[in-house]
Structure formats: C-alpha cells, structure tokens
C-alpha cells in the first residue's frame, strides 16, 4: 500500500512490522520487532527531565538474549545510535541514565538528524517537562532501505502527550536521510495511517489513591 505524505510531497512503499515483545526497563518500555532486530518504538514518562550526570563512560550494550542490530553493524556504518528514550532526560540519576544506552532503545539515524532537529526537539520537550508530566512515544517507519546490512528507518517520529490534560501536544515526523533531516508537525491520524497501527497514548488519567 502506498501513502502520500502531502506535507513532504513523497510517495513511498511503507512496510509493516509486528511488535514481538516488550522489553521493560522501568523507566521506559521498548516495543521490539524480531524481524527488524530493532525497536519499533519506545514509550516513557518524563517529569522534570535533565541533570548533571556525565555520560562519557557509557556505551551501548545488548543485555538481552535477543538478536539485534548492535556494535558490529553500527561501527563504520555512518549512522548514529539515535536514542529513543533520551539519555539527557534521565541525567538526574546516573543509574537510570545508563539504562538508556541499550540497543533496544536506539535506531540508526543520520548524524544530521540525530545531532540536528532530533536533538533540538529533545531539548524543547525536556524544557516542557519542567512544567508538566509528559508521555513520550517515539519510533521509526521503514520502507525497505538497507544500508550496510542495517534496515534503516526512512522516518523517525515522536508523539508527546500531556498527562495532566491528556492532550497530544506534539506529533513530529523527521526524514532520516543523509542530506535531508527535515522535521514536521503532522496530525496523529496522519502518523497512524503511515504506521498502520494506533499510537498507544493514554486514554484516561491515572488516579492515585492514598494508602
């Protein structure tokens, strides 16, 4: 099936993959695809993100028995290990921060995306988390592009929902190409049409009861 993304003016063959397992690390959940050997998306809650933890000694690892794209594929591939649950969001706690350095929490991103508009939006959303608790869901869309043995997402996306109002505040779509890393705001309906599945935003507020 083809879907024309009018905001970018491109027609591409969008591929469907299934989420096969959920890797729960407490601070985030990775919805992992065996066929991709990558996460389809990652979900986490952010409240007052940021901090002073030094990440200079942290390295990406695979601490599961699952086969996944890892250091052997990334080395000299030209792609960054693009965090989905952002490391700096958890820099208030080095133990939590280190947990973001997992291969089931990253996608191959071009350097100009990972260090450009992706990073800019990570900073913007972290600033917004100082005033509101946010649900962040972020992942990729694949069209069959294979670079040096890695299935590379053609797009990366990010959805942000306010947990105080349940309003979806951002739906972001980024092209993941060497010379093109445009970020666009689109609608949730447009994104879900591309994904072929519903983004798992929260439908009801969680009411905390006193013990």
Question: Model-found features: residue ranges?
Answer:
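Hydrophobic h-region of N-terminal signal peptides that target proteins for export
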Residues: 4-17
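Short, His- and charge-rich active-site/binding loops that engage polyanionic ligands
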Residues: 21-80
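Domain-level detector of nuclease and nuclease-like folds
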Residues: 64-211
């Amino acid at each position: 099936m083809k879907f024309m993304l009018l905001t970018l003016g491109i027609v591409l063959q969008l591929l469907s993959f299934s989420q096969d397992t959920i890797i729960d690390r407490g601070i985030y959940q990775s919805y992992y695809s065996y066929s991709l050997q990558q996460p389809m998306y990652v979900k986490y809650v952010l409240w007052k993100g940021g901090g002073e933890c030094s990440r200079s000694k942290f390295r990406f690892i695979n601490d599961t028995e699952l086969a996944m794209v890892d250091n052997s594929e990334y080395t000299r591939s030209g792609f960054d290990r693009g965090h989905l649950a952002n490391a700096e969001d958890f820099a208030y706690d080095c133990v939590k921060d280190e947990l973001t350095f997992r291969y089931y929490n990253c996608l191959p991103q071009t350097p100009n995306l990972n260090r450009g508009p992706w990073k800019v939006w990570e900073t913007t959303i972290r600033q917004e988390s100082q005033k509101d608790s946010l649900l962040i869901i972020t992942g990729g869309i694949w069209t069959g592009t294979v670079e040096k043995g890695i299935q590379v997402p053609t797009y990366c996306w990010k959805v942000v929902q306010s947990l105080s109002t349940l309003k979806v505040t951002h739906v972001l779509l980024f092209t993941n190409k060497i010379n093109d890393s445009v970020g666009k705001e689109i609608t949730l309906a447009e994104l879900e049409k591309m994904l072929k599945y519903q983004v798992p935003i929260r439908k009801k507020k969680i009411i905390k009861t006193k013990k």
